[in-house]
Regions:
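Single conserved hydrophobic/aromatic residue that forms the stacking wall/gate
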Residues: 1-12
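Short, hydrophobic/aromatic-enriched beta-strand segments in well-ordered soluble domains
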Residues: 14-17, 42-44, 200-213, 292
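A contiguous, surface-exposed recognition patch within enzymatic or periplasmic domains that forms
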Residues: 36, 47-55, 59-201, 209
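Asparagine-centered strand-capping/turn motif at beta-strand->loop junctions
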Residues: 43-48, 239-241
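Surface beta-strand/loop "capping" patches
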Residues: 214-245
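Beta-strand-rich binding/interaction modules
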Residues: 234-263, 287-288
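Short, aromatic- and glycine-rich surface loops/edge beta-strands on solvent-exposed regions
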Residues: 250, 281-296
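Edge beta-strands of extracellular beta-sandwich domains
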Residues: 263-264, 296-301
Length: 301
């Protein structure tokens, strides 16, 4: 809807000065025409002649149920508790975490498998995204930001047990359970603060975007989302775009450079690209899925 009353393309701004250290925070929220994402531009400013600390985590609440699972990047194999006091394998926990015995091997990316209040934060990732997905409705939410500035990737839940259910009753009449999808800037853990020098300003951008039918995301930008799964010698390719994108080449190759599949297509939130490719005896880790524009520029892989 491009009507002026909707304000698409306008920047909705808010700012505040916190009372203890007089640090100023400013945020601008923008919905762009024909783009299925929310852009957030942030600035923090130290108004004093003294070094100050700050801690920044964006924190949307996400509805969850037995079909929900967190979507962490494929290079996240372990997660930390607050203050890095405890650590667990991820997504399959195999030990004690939050005093819960997962030694049989439990997928803690799934909300239904976490019985007690639990936080987990990714340990190192070179990817720019984190999010979650509901299998039964085939839809989810992603956060995208430069991982050099925004390394924090976290999920918090009250837990899918008696204690969590009691909190659901206290917090909502009808909406049911939720998780907090938390994204840290200049920090990958809590409470891990960052410094602002006297009169220093820091700024960054964050994006939140809905997506559908992609499943367990393997890579993403604000413009494209990729998934590549392999089962029974077949590669399942899914590509989602947050806006209309024409003449996009989808290419699947192996690590030797041999092209196994390529196709030029038009993408949009309504036109999700899906394909299946026979890969014979290829190992999944030897496959590379790439997107190129019509000039041959690599967009994502």
């Amino acid at each position: 809807d491009r009507s002026p009353s909707r304000g698409l393309g306008d920047v909705y701004k808010r700012q505040e000065v916190e009372r203890m250290f007089n640090t100023k925070g400013m945020q601008g929220f923008t919905l762009h025409p024909d783009k299925a994402y929310l852009e957030i531009n942030v600035k923090v400013y130290n108004r004093t002649p003294f070094p100050q600390t700050f801690l920044w985590w964006a924190n949307p609440a996400v509805v969850v149920n037995d079909h929900y699972h967190s979507v962490f990047p494929p290079d996240v194999h372990a997660v930390f508790d607050h203050g890095k006091r405890d650590v667990s394998n991820f997504p399959i926990a195999t030990g004690i975490y939050y005093k819960q015995d997962y030694s049989e091997g439990v997928d803690i990316s799934k909300y239904k498998n976490i019985p007690v209040p639990t936080s987990y934060m990714a340990i190192k990732s070179r990817y720019d995204f984190v999010g979650g997905y509901e299998e039964h409705v085939q839809a989810g939410l992603l956060h995208v930001a430069d991982h050099h500035l925004s390394p924090g990737k976290k999920q918090w839940t009250w837990g899918n047990g008696d204690f969590g259910i009691a909190w659901d009753r206290n917090l909502t009449d009808e909406d049911g359970p939720y998780i907090e999808l938390m994204t840290g800037v200049y920090t990958d853990n809590q409470p891990d603060f960052t410094w602002l020098q006297p009169y220093e300003e820091k700024s960054w951008k964050q994006y939140f975007l809905p997506y559908s039918e992609v499943g367990y995301v393997k890579n993403a930008t604000k413009d494209f989302i990729l998934n590549l799964d392999v089962a029974e010698n077949t590669a399942h390719i899914i590509v989602y775009a947050t806006g209309r994108q024409e003449n996009i080449k989808v290419e699947l190759r192996d690590i030797t450079g041999k092209i196994l599949f390529d196709k030029v297509t038009i993408l949009s939130p309504e036109n999700i690209f899906k394909s299946q490719v026979n890969i014979a005896e290829q190992l999944p880790e030897n496959l590379i899925l790439s997107l190129y524009d019509n000039n041959g520029k690599l967009l994502l892989e």
